[in-house]
Amino acid sequence: VGEDAEAKTILNGLTLDVPAGEVHAIMGPNGAGKSTLSYVLTGRSGYEVTGGSATLNGEDILDMEPEARAAKGIFLSFQYPIEIPGVPVMTFVRTAINAQRKVRGEAEMSAPDFIKKSRDVAKMLNLDAEMLKRPVNVGFSGGEKKRLEIYQMMMLEPKFLILDETDSGLDIDALKTVADGVNAMRDPSRGMLVITHYQRLLDYIKPDKVHVLAKGQIIKTGGPELALRLEQEGYDGVLGEAA
């Protein structure tokens, strides 16, 4: 994968398999390619895939537009959620749900069903009902933006979740709330990829596997104990083993 502006190779020889029902964590130093991986999987512009494949339930997604990938069930929780002035949260989310349903040939979600589900999800995430009437992320705190990302995720019910440093900027209470929402989405039919720098998120979202990404490749894979080791020793020891 290359980034057009700099013609720089970012991911090279990366192999990753996340089975349905599992939560995998990716950790690694800055510049390792963690966010780039999330961008490539979701179809963000500015990146050229020069080889390899990425499949969801056996279907290659790399030639699909971002909205088609979303309709197939891929969801990315952004590290830095953007503001959308003039578009209320509930309008935005209901439009997204029904756009995906249309692509899949399903009936639209009715207003009463949407409102009931929205209230239930908002309550779990400690989101004020008035917040959902405001423009998307406009004037929201960092923690509110992250909780709103999880609200969208729970409303859309994707098949494959990518959380890109969702824990950044969260205090411990907000972190627990976000983790509760993510854990509520764990399901035998759903895979999750959690990208993080810190062990603390993995105290609440227990991964099945932890991968270390460095220089565009996964250099080591282990269980939750690998994240604990990284927290205690840093990346140098693991990087040295892979050298």
Where are these regions (language model features)?
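ABC-family P-loop ATPase nucleotide-binding domains
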Residues: 82-159
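Walker B catalytic motif
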Residues: 165-166, 173
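The feature captures the beta-strand-to-loop junction immediately N-terminal to the Walker
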Residues: 27-29
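ABC ATPase NBD Q-loop/coupling interface
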Residues: 53-69, 137
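Conserved beta-strand-loop-alpha-helix hinge in the C-terminal portion
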Residues: 209, 213, 217-240
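Helical segment within the ABC ATPase nucleotide-binding domain
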Residues: 175-188
